Amino acid sequence: MFPRCFLFGSDLMDLQLTQRNSISNHGASDSAPMRESDDRVIETSIPARLDDLRWSGFHTRVVLALGITWILDGLEVTLAGALSGALKESPTLQFSNFDVGLANSAYLAGAVLGALGFGWLTDRIGRKKLFFITLALYLAATAATALSWSVTSYALFRFLTGAGIGGEYTAINSTIQELVPARYRGWTDLVINGSFWLGAAMGAVAAIVLLDPALIGPDMGWRLAYLTGACLGLVVFVMRMWIPESPRWLMIHGRPDQAHAIVDDIERSALGRVQDQPQRAWPKIKLKMRDHTPLREVAHTLFVSYRQRSLVGLVLMIAQAFFYNAIFFTFALILTDFFGIASNQVGWYILPFAAGNFLGPLLLGRLFDTLGRRVMITLTYGVSGVLLALSGYLFSIGALSAQTQTIAWMVIFFFASPAASAAYLTVSETFPLEVRALAIALFYAVGTGIGGVVGPALFGALIDTGSRNSVFAGYLLGAALMVVAAAVAWRYCIAAERKSLESVARPLAFME
């Protein structure tokens, strides 16, 4: 367990006393929020103080406790892909390829609706409450999936699991963006999103063991695989007890003193002391606090004030969602139906695939903060699309073996993984704080709904034809979407690297 360096464990109930002491000790400091004659207007340096911090144990704990969402999602998606053969062989479920695609689409449909519903709540009631609610839903639904008795029940529980994960994406992306200093934001976001593939590797290993008929019966292995995910999620509850509410969210929503106390504690954790204004003249912003942001203002912000940014986010999300979900959800079917790989051996092929996906963000991520968003998003989307078209052609003419096909996927997704992560980075940093979570939810939902839900079902149907040329046509569609997204990024992407969130997108509550 992480050492307790600040006030967010069992001391949470004493926060009001802490705030009073903090205000008493630092009330004369210019870093404290200053109220004007209008009690709803404040001047604060909280964003500048958060961005001024060096990387510390606090930030590492935030990344571990919140970033594990992507590990859970990777575990879920990999199990869904690796277990497809086992579900077809299950004496209870007896799935067809269409049933596999349908269940995977149910998971993504749940993620779409969960992102929208929980995204709205995240902006309204706060980040911290939501990342406990969504985790609870994920745990319950994943455990229930292990008890499925029919195609319908399995699809329903996968839908609910997806809803939990979709909600996690909105709450977690918002919180990480708002707590991580600006100069680390791009690399951190990409690596956290890339940690999806650590979960994928875990799922692959679990599938290898749990699907071995010599060890576990054909109708029990896949059930134990889902219980593995639920058990992992229990650990996350403890880890998240130490994570505070976003100070940026608090300062907007009428709780500036609590936000100031939290930043004081973060500074003590990172620096061993609270920074004072005389040591560093932080820029301040003037804000008019609000309880919530009306949906009409949200819609106007996204589709009028930030229409061009919305278009960029939508294109990037649709392209990467179709590209990723269509290929990865049907990964096992390609290996079993076209290359004759036994379903209990698919996990071995996922491991190198997962390695390429994790190494991409890890090795290329820093370039998003140095060379910049526009250059790197264009490069990764464009290269991914071209490589998929080339490998798809080689697949169609039968020039690839199971091993060389896996190597091709590994190289493709070395570039596609940071591209997909950059889509989330783009939509989470280029909109105002008050609508950030809902913006993430909306573009994730639309992108996944169009690209993700359709993709697995389409590829499942293409694979069922038994025609390599039909599958190649699907690959060409995914490649074309990525190339189009690359062109859009080159023309319209925002240069948000190393800039504060408030300078990239001014808060709606900002006052001159």
Spans of model-derived segments:
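Transmembrane-helix signature of 12-pass secondary carriers
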Residues: F2-F8, L12-E512
